[in-house]
């Protein structure tokens, strides 16, 4: 009889404290930084790209909604395990066993949701926690593993960083579920939906920041302070503080010999430019 090799019963990608931390690459994101993150991913190191994609989902509610719709379309489907040969008793027995194992997982829908993270990021990985009972190898649990724990080496082999091997090891056979989603052809590091929309996300980020700044001052006159020639640094500082105070409290005091002038902003300019750009992105 052919000997069947048992899977690894040990936990390989043990959760580590640094897994929950991020370098928050979206903070101060620029075209140069985004290009640098993508170059790292193209070379096999997807850590910063995975962190960026995670932030993009958190910060853009429309983007999150679109990805969630795709995921829910899958998790909402019914499923069944069909035997390879419906006339073969052994095949039917195997199918029934597999289905019972899936049903025994506390929340198989969460397992699917974790693996569907590949839609945005191009790849998602979960580790199978194997057990042995009554002479059978069983699935005790399926645990999501963060994408930043994985990378491609110089030979383009997929590896996982572990506590004992931070330099990475090849994935043990029958130990990990790797979902590679292809929004487009090419390497998995470049195949996720978020890779395609990242540039628009960056430009939208710039636009929203400028739009918020614009909204803060739109319709408000420019507050121009004038100080007398020979005014001291203390007088200049007091005048500036008064200008700021007027902006928030609509009242203020200034030293004698100084003046505040209000200049109305030009309202003839187009005010929907920011909204049009945000909608495009």
Stretches found by the model and what they are:
Residues 227-231, 254-280:
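Extended, non-catalytic structural segments that build the interaction scaffolds
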């Amino acid at each position: 009889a052919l000997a069947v090799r048992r899977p690894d019963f040990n936990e390989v990608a043990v959760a580590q404290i640094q897994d929950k931390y991020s370098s928050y690459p979206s903070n101060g994101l620029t075209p140069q930084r985004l290009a640098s993150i993508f170059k790292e991913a193209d070379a096999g190191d997807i850590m910063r790209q995975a962190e960026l994609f995670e932030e993009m989902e958190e910060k853009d509610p429309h983007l999150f909604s679109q990805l969630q719709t795709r995921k829910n379309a899958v998790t909402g489907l019914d499923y069944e395990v069909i035997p390879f040969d419906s006339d073969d008793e052994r095949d039917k027995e195997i199918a029934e066993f597999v289905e019972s194992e899936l049903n025994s997982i506390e929340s198989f829908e969460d397992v699917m949701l974790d693996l569907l993270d590949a839609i945005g990021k191009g790849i998602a990985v979960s580790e199978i926690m194997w057990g042995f009972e009554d002479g059978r190898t069983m699935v005790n649990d399926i645990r999501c593993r963060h994408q930043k724990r994985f990378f491609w080496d110089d030979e383009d082999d997929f590896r996982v960083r572990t506590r004992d091997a931070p330099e990475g090891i090849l994935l043990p056979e029958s130990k990990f579920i790797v979902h590679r989603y292809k929004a487009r052809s090419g390497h998995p590091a470049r195949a996720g939906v978020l890779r395609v929309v990242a540039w628009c996300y960056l430009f939208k980020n710039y636009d929203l920041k400028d739009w918020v700044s614009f909204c803060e001052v739109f319709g408000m006159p420019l507050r121009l302070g004038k100080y007398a020639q020979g005014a001291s640094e203390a007088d200049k500082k007091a005048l500036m503080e008064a200008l700021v105070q007027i902006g928030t409290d609509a009242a203020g005091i200034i030293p004698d010999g100084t003046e505040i002038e209000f200049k109305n902003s030009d309202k003839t300019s187009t005010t929907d430019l920011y909204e049009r750009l945000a909608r495009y992105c």
